[in-house]
Structures are given as C-alpha cells and as structure tokens.
UniProtKB/Swiss-Prot annotation:
GO MF annotation terms: kynureninase activity; pyridoxal phosphate binding
InterPro entries (alphabetical): Kynureninase, PyrdxlP-dep_Trfase, PyrdxlP-dep_Trfase_major, PyrdxlP-dep_Trfase_small
Protein name, entry field: Kynureninase
Class of this enzyme: hydrolase
Record GO cellular component, one term: cytoplasm
Annotated keywords: Hydrolase, Pyridine nucleotide biosynthesis, Pyridoxal phosphate
Residues recorded as bearing N6-(pyridoxal phosphate)lysine in the entry: 244
Record field: catalytic activity: L-kynurenine + H2O = anthranilate + L-alanine + H(+); 3-hydroxy-L-kynurenine + H2O = 3-hydroxyanthranilate + L-alanine + H(+)
Assembly and oligomerization: Homodimer.
C-alpha cells in the first residue's frame, strides 16, 4: 500500500502532472548545484524563459526603427498594451474592454478612488478589513484627507472574528449592514495578504450595492492565483500588481479593471493624454475625449519594455488555463497542509482557512515559540535553499505555485522544518 504522504508518492504525482512541462518554461535561482525550492511566487514570480526574447524584440525594434516603432514593426508600441489585454481579461473574468495594464497598484488605486469614491455629507465612509496591506490603508487615508475628511471617523475597519485572525462572511455582512447608510465605498482584497484568506467577492458586492456603496478590490494576491469573475460579480473597479503570480518581473506594470457599466460614464477622473480616444489622440486637441472602458483611465504611454515579460507569462496562462491551474493548486496546497498536520503539527500552526474555497495557493504559518523561533526557522530554510517569505510580526508564507512548483518541493520544505526542529 502506497504511503500517500511519502516522497515516492509525491514523485509519482509529479510524474503524472499534466502541467509538469510548464516548469521548464521558467528560470530558477540556483542553490549550489540545484534549483532553489522556490515557494515564494506570492511575493515575486519566477522569470518566464520567453521574457528575455520578448524584451529583446522590443529592444531590437527600438534600435532598428527608433521612434517609428510606435507605428510600424512586428509589434507597434502604440497598441502594445493591447497585446496583453485579452489574456488579462481571461485571467480576471472580464470583458476585454474592462481591463488595462498600466502604472502600478497603488497609483491605480488612487486613480480609481478619484473616480469611484464620491463622498456626500451623509455617505462618506470607506470600509476595509483590519490589517489591510499598508499601501491600501495609506491610499485610503490620504484620499480621505484630500477631501477634508478625518480617517478616525470615516475609515471603518472590520476586525477579524475567527481564531487565527481570519474573517467570517457573517462579520463582513454585519459591518456592511451596520454602516450601510454611511458607506460610499467598500474596498476589499480578493485574498488577504497576511493570512492567505480568500473572500466571496460576489457576495460582498451584492451586500454593498444593496446599501448603495461602490465596491473596489485589491487583487494583488488573487490575480493568477484563484479564478476570478469580476464582470459577473459586478465589481466597480479592481487593481492589482503583475509581479507575483503573473510573473511580470520586479516592479512590473500593474493592472486595472473598470466594469463595462462605467465604460462611457461621465465619472470624474484624473486624465492624461494616453487615456484620450485613440483615433484622435495625436490631433493634440485640448478637449479630453476618454477612450471607452478601462483604457480611458490611462495617463501616459505604456512602458513597453515592462509589458514584454507580462506578455510572455500570459502566454503560459493561456496554454494551461485557469481551471487546470486552480485544480493543481488545490491539490498542491492540500498536500502541503496534510504534510504539515502529519509531520510537524507541534512546530507549525496553519493560519490560512482549511476550506479550499477560502484560500488560494498560499499557506500562512506561525511557528511555535513565537517570533524569535519563527525567524530562526525562516533563516534556516533560506540557508537550505528553501524560499518562503516573512511577514511581521510572526508569519511565514509558503506558496506552491501550480505553474512551476512540484509536490516534491513540499516534501523538501517539510523535511527542512523537521531538520530545524531536531537541531
């Protein structure tokens, strides 16, 4: 009888994995004479091998054509951002006109809040989760202050109500109902960055819209990780980074979604020339005529060199399909959970919810003994070539990414935890 928690079984799962060839499409950092055990794609995804060729293509076109590369050549820069549009739309469950790759997450969040946060005397509050990613909180507080409002009275935080610091849907629903008449905006993550908890965005949208509030989402840890259905869910706007699960490189261009019901609206916006309607953009008319859809929120011409790695990665997402990636992800993370509970339960506490629908690929882990022990284990793993990441005050995040991680990687991780505990 096969031991389902043995390395031999993990090797068999890897051999039978229909997505196993995708691993070869990525460049792995090295640890001595072997690949690192890279379990930190939730922080920075690996480099797609095709990225170099696509960046070189842009460089070659620049060298050969100069400024003419905007309008001629194999990939005209005028419309280069549209080369990633359709694939991005498939990843987030949107119509092509609802998405655009531009700026970075925090910049896009400010742009979206300038349009969608419309406070009135009666309705000016913003609802977020307690412990939101700091940049989101900074953005929200600064948007409130820009409008002469006090975050102490207009920023509402929903506190965790579950033992490991996670949030029940009931707590979110109660907060929306309690503060509904005051709410102008609900800003919510697809996945909470520290706990790894995934949220039912469709239900949050339903509850918020019933109260008359707009809904925006930070999808930094959700995009490319879990299936998303932004259009059908009715989210007003969403923003994300592309350097985590979408593997577009450090500081990569971000992404933005605007629901099609706002495509031709007269929402106020911070405007720039690249958001002007494409057919008349180069007439340089003084009157701003926005492009329909999300592209109407662009400010400047796209960073083509930064878009090239994203284009390379999205080709792999199309090759695999989100459904197949999610199926493998659930198996990988489930296997990691089983290994931890069976072999190192006295060392690691799993913070992330156990239900597959309430998490993505990431497991957030607390180490018995507190922060000092946690840092000791984290440094041991790093020295052994096993990469996760650390989030204060006491969480190690481990994220088996289905594009390139293997079941055997999880045994390497747990084996190193055992080695540290035995030392």
């Amino acid at each position: 009888m096969t031991d389902l928690l043995s390395r031999a079984h993990a090797d068999a799962l890897d051999a039978a994995d229909p997505l196993r060839s995708l691993r070869d499409a990525f460049v792995f950092p090295q640890h001595g004479d072997r690949d690192q055990t890279y379990l930190v794609g939730n922080s920075l995804g690996l480099q797609p091998r095709a990225a170099r060729a696509m960046v070189d293509e842009v460089l070659d076109q620049w060298g050969t054509l100069g400024v003419e590369g905007h309008f001629t050549g194999p990939t005209q820069w005028l419309t280069y951002h549209q080369l990633v549009r359709d694939a991005l739309a498939r990843v987030v469950g949107a119509q092509p006109g609802e998405v655009v790759a531009m700026n970075t997450l925090s910049v896009n969040l400010h742009l979206m809040m300038a349009s969608f946060y419309r406070p009135t005397h009666e309705r000016g509050a913003i609802l977020i989760e307690a412990g939101a990613f700091p940049s989101d909180r900074h953005a929200v507080e600064s948007q409130l202050r820009l409008r002469g409002l006090d975050p102490a009275t207009h920023l509402i935080e929903v506190e965790a109500d579950e033992p490991n610091g996670t949030l029940s849907m009931a707590a979110i629903a109660d907060a929306i109902a309690q503060h509904g008449p005051r709410l102008a905006l609900v800003l919510w993550p697809g996945i909470q960055y520290r706990t790894g908890q995934a949220f039912d965005l469709a239900e949050i949208v339903r509850l918020a819209r019933a109260q008359g509030a707009a809904v925006g989402c930070d999808l930094a840890h959700a995009v490319g990780n879990i299936p998303l259905t932004l259009h059908d869910d009715g989210v007003d706007f969403a923003v994300w980074c592309n350097y985590k699960y979408l593997n577009a490189g450090p500081g990569a261009v971000g992404g933005c979604f605007v629901h099609e019901r706002h495509a031709n609206s007269d929402l106020p916006r911070i405007a720039g020339w690249w958001g002007h309607e494409q057919q008349t953009r180069f007439r340089m008319d003084p009157q701003f005529v926005p492009s329909p859809g999300a592209e109407g929120w662009q400010l400047s011409n796209p960073p083509v060199l930064a878009l090239a790695p994203l284009r390379a990665s999205l080709t792999l997402f199309d090759q695999a399909g989100m459904a197949a990636l999610r199926a493998k992800s659930e198996r990988l993370t489930g296997h990691l959970e089983q290994l931890i509970r069976a072999r190192v339960p006295q060392v690691l506490q799993i913070v992330t919810p156990a239900e597959p629908m309430r998490r993505g690929c990431q497991l957030s882990l607390r180490v018995a003994g507190g922060r000092a022990q946690g840092r000791s284990l984290f440094e041991h793993l790093h020295a052994a070539g096993v990469l996760g990441d650390w989030r204060e005050p006491d969480v190690i995040r481990i994220a088996p990414v289905p594009l390139y991680n293997r079941f055997s990687d999880l045994h390497t991780f747990v084996g190193q935890v055992e080695a540290w505990a035995a030392a």
